């Protein structure tokens, strides 16, 4: 291991030496650029673009382009990138991540690679964690890019498709990661090329890259439609759960105590019923066996109710706003996530727990993981001050290297060892005493908490101590920038949950660095608990000591903190026993404790990485399917050629499947088998008068296929004759194909989503769930392709084509919307019209639509009460 570490350090040194040389090359242009007039400097942009058009690469232009942007920044922004910022910019251009400490000017660093890559005209996406930062950075840096002759756009959730398209067509586009991903999904749900907003993905530069590519990667981006409501079952399961005896996650000291109705695994945060709990469930729901196959749906509701009541914690995992809406709290930033909902019914279970209106369950219509979205960019890079702890993940998932960049000035912040107390009460008393001591000296203080309830508890204690302060948590995040901007003023006390205002610098006010005692100089950061991720702790520390300013950091811990309870070892418990003997106020400073905490954090980080990797592994299974379907959709939307050859292939394969299926089920020489085949053909492809039993009788399978195909070609030609105009024919072909593909694709990914839940249980049978998922999804994909071709054939053959005017009137209405929850209907139903009767059909009879499925498994799902 030491050899590996030594090698990594040597590689970093070698890379820094190379970057240093390149930065000096950029600086060698400084005098030349300084002597240019504004007009001459601005003229450099079209000149560089022309050189690219003539064949020079971006790498060829790097030194000069960086120097142009650097000089322009001095004239427009009054800021001149330092040597280390040039080094960081080169790393960004290379598609990697420079690790730059807080306050080292990452936003200014990004201007140089953004300018260089925007010269290609292929688009640069600057990605931020929220819309406030996207708007702020676009406004501030957009002034520089516009001065240099580049166009700058801002992509927000509230913008219309036209406004989004305009933003994406700019040289540089600012956006959040979620909005980029959702726009990609929406683009692959529209039915007309004019409704698409994104261009091909070229270069993304991600600010706070660890937050977006790591922390947010556990949650896939999903566009949903409404599914049927099951509110009564959620309330019933919640009523049952509230009768159970056991511990909540936040107070649990062990997984299980004798007599409990459920047990919690503290490390994995999972929950299950004990034998006592199962007995109670069977009595409550009046069933014989809770885990019988016929009760699978019920166990799903019970499992969610257990998680909602005993694992998901109010004001930590979620909060309820004034509109009685349950909002998820991002565990890494402390911000709420409006518009995002827990999947698989968990959100509805929390709504039942909190006795607020239950929103309908959703049906997945389109989804993608953050990882697979960003891996589609030709080049991906990002900036952060805390990425080294996740270096393996960046390398394995994104093929990105982390390069630590030296600070412009030496770090002067004093980082004190952690202080460990036996109880929460003793810890918070020590925290308040420290705040009083520092506040009396006029030192600005930032107090970091992990949960909203902790921030409110400290706030209450500060009110009692008559210390004025500000609270920044998920409940008042809208004042974030204003609160953080004032947090460096003399005497300011600010409590922040997790986020500590990432993206907004805390600038020190007058007199703050002048104190005689170094302990009271600069901003004091007080951590009230270690986060499960070392990066979040480092981000909190990094709020102090920016650009060589003095500062101090101190973490206060308790053996009753959640992290210690989840991963505390026997050796720590021995400390606890000794400390209780010596009194509640006893405090430990120990290297062993610090190492134990870091070891616990590494284990949690490892678990989280495994979780993100598993999300990606599942999404990788359908990635190829998604790319094929989306590519084919785009071909259909963009083509100006008649699609008859494509349709003929679908017709032929559908006929082959129908004949082969009947041949497998019986003998084609048998009259009953031929009659069944004839009925299927008449139901799905041809009018009754177009084909008769006598024509099929006695033919071989291949001869039957040829005969039916000839008649289908004839029927298709007569259908197209009703649309004499080739443009109308293409419009009709496109409408049918897109409607069928979209319906089947959304059904397919929703089925995959449900199947994923079930294959997880197969791990208990020593089967690899990922392998099972791969095999099942491949079969389901092939079935979906068959269903698409069958349905396209049926609609093309059986549709009652309406007059051209009807189609012409409907075309302008084929649009999608920017509102996530409204994306449900993307196909123009009115251009295809056919009545099929579903009356008096038995559950096990063949479906009248001709799919070959039983009625209960096809249209019977919606027609059987």
Curated annotation (Swiss-Prot):
Binding residue positions for ATP: 85, 103-107, 505
Bilayer topology annotation: Peripheral membrane protein
Any GO molecular function: metal ion binding
Main location per the UniProt record: membrane
Places the protein is found: Cell membrane; Cytoplasm
Cofactor descriptive note: May bind 1 zinc ion per subunit.
Record EC number: 7.4.2.8
Catalytic activity, reaction form: ATP + H2O + cellular proteinSide 1 = ADP + phosphate + cellular proteinSide 2
HAMAP family assigned: SecA
Subunit structure comment from the entry: Monomer and homodimer. Part of the essential Sec protein translocation apparatus which comprises SecA, SecYEG and auxiliary proteins SecDF. Other proteins may also be involved.
Protein name: Protein translocase subunit SecA
Source organism per UniProt: Lactococcus lactis subsp. cremoris (strain SK11)
């Amino acid at each position: 291991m030491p050899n590996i570490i030594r090698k990594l350090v040597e590689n970093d040194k070698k890379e820094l030496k190379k970057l240093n040389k390149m930065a000096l090359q950029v600086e060698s242009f400084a005098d030349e650029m300084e002597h240019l007039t504004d007009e001459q400097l601005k003229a450099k942009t079209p000149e560089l673009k022309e050189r690219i058009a003539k064949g020079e690469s971006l790498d060829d232009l790097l030194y000069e382009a960086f120097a142009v942007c650097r000089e322009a920044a001095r004239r427009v922004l009054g800021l001149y990138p330092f040597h280390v910022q040039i080094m960081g910019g080169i790393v960004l251009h290379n598609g990697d991540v420079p690790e730059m400490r807080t306050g080292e000017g990452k936003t200014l660093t990004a201007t140089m690679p953004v300018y260089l890559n925007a010269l290609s005209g292929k688009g640069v996406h600057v990605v931020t964690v929220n819309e406030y930062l996207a708007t702020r950075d676009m406004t501030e840096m957009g002034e520089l890019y516009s001065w240099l002759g580049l166009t700058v756009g801002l992509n927000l959730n509230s913008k219309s498709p036209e406004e989004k398209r305009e933003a994406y067509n700019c040289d540089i586009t600012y956006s959040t990661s979620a909005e980029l991903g959702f726009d990609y999904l929406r683009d692959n749900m529209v039915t007309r090329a004019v409704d698409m907003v994104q261009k091909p993905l070229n270069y993304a530069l991600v600010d706070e890259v660890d937050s977006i590519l790591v922390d947010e990667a556990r949650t896939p981006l999903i566009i949903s439609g409404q599914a049927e409501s099951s509110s009564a079952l959620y309330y019933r399961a919640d009523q049952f759960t509230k009768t159970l005896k056991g511990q909540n996650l936040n107070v649990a000291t062990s997984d299980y105590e004798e007599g409990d109705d459920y047990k919690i695994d503290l490390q994995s945060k999972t929950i299950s019923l004990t034998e006592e709990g199962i007995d109670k469930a069977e009595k409550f729901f009046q069933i014989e066996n809770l885990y019988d196959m016929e009760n699978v749906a019920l166990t799903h509701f019970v499992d969610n109710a257990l998680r909602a009541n005993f694992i998901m914690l109010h004001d930590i995992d979620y909060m309820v706003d004034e509109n009685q809406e349950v909002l998820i709290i991002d565990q890494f930033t402390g911000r709420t996530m409006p518009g995002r909902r827990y999947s698989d019914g968990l959100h509805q279970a929390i709504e039942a727990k909190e006795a607020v209106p239950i929103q309908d369950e959703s049906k997945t219509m389109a989804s993608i993981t953050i990882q697979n979205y960003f891996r589609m960019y030709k080049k991906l890079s990002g900036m952060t001050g805390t990425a080294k702890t996740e270096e393996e993940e960046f390398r394995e998932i994104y093929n990105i290297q982390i390069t630590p960049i030296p600070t412009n000035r030496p770090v002067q912040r004093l980082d004190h060892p952690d202080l460990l107390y036996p109880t929460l009460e003793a810890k918070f008393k020590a925290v308040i005493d420290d705040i009083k001591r520092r506040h009396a000296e006029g030192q600005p203080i930032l107090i970091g908490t992990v949960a909203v309830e902790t921030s409110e508890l400290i706030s209450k204690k500060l009110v009692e101590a008559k210390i004025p302060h500000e609270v920044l948590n998920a409940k008042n995040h809208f004042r974030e920038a204003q609160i953080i901007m004032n947090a460096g003023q003399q005497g300011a006390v600010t409590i922040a949950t997790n986020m500590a205002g990432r993206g907004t610098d805390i600038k020190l006010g007058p007199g703050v660095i002048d104190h005689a005692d170094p302990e009271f100089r600069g901003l004091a950061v007080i951590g009230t608990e270690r986060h499960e991720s070392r990066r979040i702790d480092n981000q909190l520390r990094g709020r102090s000591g920016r650009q060589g300013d003095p500062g101090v950091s101190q973490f206060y811990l308790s053996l009753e903190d959640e992290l210690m309870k989840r991963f505390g070892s026997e050796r720590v418990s021995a400390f606890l026993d000794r400390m209780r003997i010596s009194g509640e106020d006893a405090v430990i400073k120990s290297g062993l404790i610090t190492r134990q905490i870091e070891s616990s954090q590494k284990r949690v980080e490892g678990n989280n990485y495994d979780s993100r990797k598993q999300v990606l592994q599942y999404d990788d299974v359908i990635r190829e399917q998604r790319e094929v379907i989306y590519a084919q959709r785009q071909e259909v939307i963009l083509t100006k050629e008649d699609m008859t050859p494509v349709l003929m292939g679908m017709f032929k394969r559908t006929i082959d499947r129908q004949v082969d299926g009947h041949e497998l089920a019986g003998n084609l020489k048998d009259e009953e088998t031929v009659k069944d085949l004839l009925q299927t053909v008449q139901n799905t492809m041809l009018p009754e008068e177009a084909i008769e039993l006598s024509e099929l009788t006695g033919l071989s399978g291949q001869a039957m296929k040829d005969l039916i195909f000839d008649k289908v070609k004839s029927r298709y030609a007569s259908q197209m004759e009703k649309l004499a105009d080739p443009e109308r024919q293409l419009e009709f072909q496109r409408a049918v194909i897109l409607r069928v593909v979209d319906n089947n694709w959304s059904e397919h990914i929703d089925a995959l989503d449900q199947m994923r839940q079930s294959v997880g249980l197969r791990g208990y049978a020593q089967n690899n769930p990922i392998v099972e998922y791969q095999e099942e999804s491949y079969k389901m994909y092939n079935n979906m392709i068959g269903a698409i071709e069958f349905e396209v054939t049926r609609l093309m053959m059986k549709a009652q084509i309406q007059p051209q005017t009807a189609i012409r009137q409907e075309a302008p209405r084929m649009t999608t919307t920017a509102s996530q929850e409204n994306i449900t209907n993307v196909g123009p139903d009115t251009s295809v019209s056919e009545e099929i009767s579903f009356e008096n059909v038995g559950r096990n009879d063949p479906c009248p639509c001709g799919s070959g499925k039983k009625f209960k498994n096809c249209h019977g799902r919606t027609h059987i009460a």
